[in-house]
Amino acid sequence: MSTTLFARDAKRFRRIDIHHHYFPSNLEKEKSNADVGWRTPAENLPWSLDISLSAMDAMNVDLAILSFPALSSGFISKDNRHTARTRNEFAASICHAHPSRFGFFATLPFLDDVEGICSLHEIAYTFDELHANGVSISSSYGEGVVATYIGDKRYDPIWAELNKRQAVVFLHGSQIPSSTPYPHPCLGLPITEVPNETFKAAAHLVVTGNRRKFPDVRIILAHLGGSTPFLASRVAVLSNHMGCILTPEEILDDFKTFYYETALSAYEPNLAAIEKFVQHDHILFGTDFPGTFTRLTAFYAFRI
């Protein structure tokens, strides 16, 4: 199931929305929005399947891949594992009821839950029993000085399992504060931090050699990779001076193995830049619905 998004089955659809969230009814979305300085469009809350289907029809989207922002903070606990399982079974039930309109990326438990192999169990369950199209992961796990980016060796067993399955991974930047506050209420974490967190995670995968160690994992970077297309060359030029053993050419080659989706990034200069950077089949369509849906979103949906 995990590879069909990039192969034969994708040809059956006019447009696939690779970045489409679902919000369970027990999620206090308004509260979590307030924590990061974001306002989900009021008409999209409380979220329902009909709201997504209506938006998909408006944008000529045939298939949406549902995902829930990864569990990037918290503790290794039964509650955390239960939350991941419940969300995955909820998403799978939607796909079962509407197989021609939805697929889903599975949510993993807090990724540090490696020692108890809970994340590995959830990977097996969601692929083998729920038929997930891939998994959704965060750029880092934990908070503050103990936050760990996803290329860390502690996560190697997870990457090894995903590599063995030739899995699709949807990588979304964490909504975590930087060491300085965001500069203005109109420039909250989704604007100032998430794009850079995506870049930091992608760059971490590259310079640690993780991307080369697990080459069969197909990684999609949310929001056109955030700042990745514009900073990849900076990594290539400077990281050797800080101990990276890869050549600049190898670094750029590894950045080009990622897939880049267009949510909140489908501005013509951005698209022109990414088309110069990666092959066209590595550029995917995404909307970030229902977190956002504006006239601009719909406008660019018809231009891609």
What is each stretch, according to the model?
Residues 55-62, 93-102, 165, 209-217, ...:
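A structural motif corresponding to the C-terminal end of an alpha-helix
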Residues 19, 56, 91, 126, ...:
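Conserved, mostly hydrophobic/aromatic
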Residues 53, 186-206, 214, 218-304:
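H/E-rich (His + Asp/Glu) clusters that bind or coordinate divalent metals
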Residues 47-56, 115-126, 268-273:
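Short, acidic/polar
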Residues 62, 68-201:
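Active-site gating/metal-coordination segments in enzymes
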Residues 16-20, 64-66, 103-106, 135-137, ...:
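Hydrophobic faces of well-ordered beta-strands that scaffold small-molecule active sites
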Residues 20-22, 173-178, 290-291:
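Short glycine-enriched loops at secondary-structure junctions
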Residues 2-65:
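An N-terminally biased module of ancient metal coordination in phosphate/nucleic-acid-related enzymes
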